[in-house]
Amino acid sequence: MPNSKIGGHYSQAYDEELQQAVVRLLQMAALAQQQLDDAMTAFIGADAELAQQVKDFDRKVNNFEVDIDEHCLDILARRQPAATDLRLVLSVLKSVNDIERIGDLAKRIAKALLKDESGNRPTEVQLAQLNTMGAKVQQ
């Protein structure tokens, strides 16, 4: 990561462990964002196949959460970070939780489409509101 403030420790391995936590977090965030985009697209376009892919994709996001949690707990146990490093690790742990929740909500959107067998489609106004909500979430 260019211009990163992570580093400057005597142990290069420690710097790399902290950097890896952030990199994994960003990868997870990108996956969850794609999952949400796909869920919105599937819902608006009534695309059951894409909705099923969103549901199936949730496992990847959940696996990232477990992996990052274990990585951060390992850092806490072995390195006993202080000050800035501790705040970084705790921020990653909190963010992972929030990102995983976004993935869960995207899955719920997909499941709602898959369960709706009535063929009822949202009105144009409802679709516009849904697009607005989706755009706000992406910010």
Task: Explain the meaning of each model-derived region.
Residues 1-139:
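Cytosolic, long alpha-helical scaffolding segments
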